[in-house]
Amino acid sequence: MTDEESRALYDRALSVMPGGVNSSVRATQPYPFFIERGDGATVIDADGTRYLDYVMGYGPLLYGHDLPEPVNAAIQSYTSEGPMYGAPTPIEVEHAEFVARHVPSVEMIRFVNSGTEATVSAVRLARGYTGRDKIVVMKGGYHGAQESTLVEGDPMHVEPSTPGIPSSFAKHTLPVPFNDLEAITTVFETHGEDIAAVLTEPILANNGIVRPVDGYLEHLRSLTTEHNSLLIFDEVITGFRVGGLGCAQSKFGVTPDVTTFGKIIGGGFPVGAIGGRADIIEHFTPSGDVFQSGTFSGHPVTMAAGYESLKYAAENDVYDHVNRLGERLRGGITDIATDQSPSAIVVGLDSMFKTVFEREGSTTDDGDVCSAGCEQRESCMRYDDCPKTGADVSSAETERWERIFWQEMRDHNIFLTANQFESQFVSYAHTDEDIDRTLEAYKSAL
């Protein structure tokens, strides 16, 4: 394996792009390998090395790197008819109607250009709709590069988590631990009349895939209803990945007031969306008074790719395939970790998976255990080992993942996300043979 071309490209990139990348998560150590093209479930780098890909663009690529023919045909058709028009298009209406038919919370939807733009708009909408300022977020949750949610601390001592954000912004945000019923209850007892919304991922999908414990999402639904606050689910990652076309909210049986989307809803193209109850969403301009607009919003090529991607999933065995392989992969990694690396906790569901390296070994591997990744099941003998909060993942052996495990898997030509926090994904292009090969690599690397 040689990296000569990637190294040369990295040196060039360093002179014109900060850190040599356009997204910090791509800055793998000691330097990134530069991808030239994708092929099915694989990517090929600038040096011609082929990797089995589980990054999948960090989530948007439900089908891998070869789109189904109807999706490709739609993309080509809309591209040939002109890049954009500055006016509404029929495909926007079709895509919006499809999403509204399948996602429980969505009666109306506004398409935007990224997941970050979706969550920024959702926070503004919640404040405009309720007339309140405070937003509750989960520690370890991620809602894009926006000032309202890049915070750290606790409700009494909140600070921005990055330079460049005034402290005055952070005072309107209340961070609490995910899965902590007492903490969220206390926040509402103290600030309930000022809380515009609770903004949370139904699963902490950007921080080790932390699933909700039984009753937690239901408790959020109850508290927000009681205090006339909004419940916003950030399904940028889980949308149309977990729970199929109904998204994670349908899998867990909890319907939020507003949902944000990104990634899969655009079929692999830049996209975001805010959907929810009609009486809330119509507060966006021009029907309401909460300003929201964008030059590229509802871009026809993106709308066509997203609509045809979801339509194909509705008509074929896409979710059965990816979820079966995801369960098989998590189960296989669980068996390997039990034998070779007791400190490794396998997390994920449906077609998502990750391995978290805890600093202490498992309390037990005997008796009733989750066979294909942590399910937050109290009867499981490893329940106490399973991450419950973002802090549980942040305190794990992140350096083992980045400096040892990721490099070992790359040596086996397996492309995983480069830190312990980001999820990995099985696509429709993956096969049972790919899973076999991946498990052999895990066996060696663990």
From Swiss-Prot:
One of its GO terms (molecular function) is transaminase activity. InterPro entries: 4pyrrol_synth_GluAld_NH2Trfase, Aminotrans_3, Aminotrans_3_PPA_site, PyrdxlP-dep_Trfase, PyrdxlP-dep_Trfase_major, PyrdxlP-dep_Trfase_small. Pathway: Porphyrin-containing compound metabolism; protoporphyrin-IX biosynthesis; 5-aminolevulinate from L-glutamyl-tRNA(Glu): step 2/2. The keyword Cytoplasm applies. Keywords: Cytoplasm, Isomerase, Porphyrin biosynthesis, Pyridoxal phosphate. Its cofactor is pyridoxal 5'-phosphate. This is Glutamate-1-semialdehyde 2,1-aminomutase. The gene is hemL.
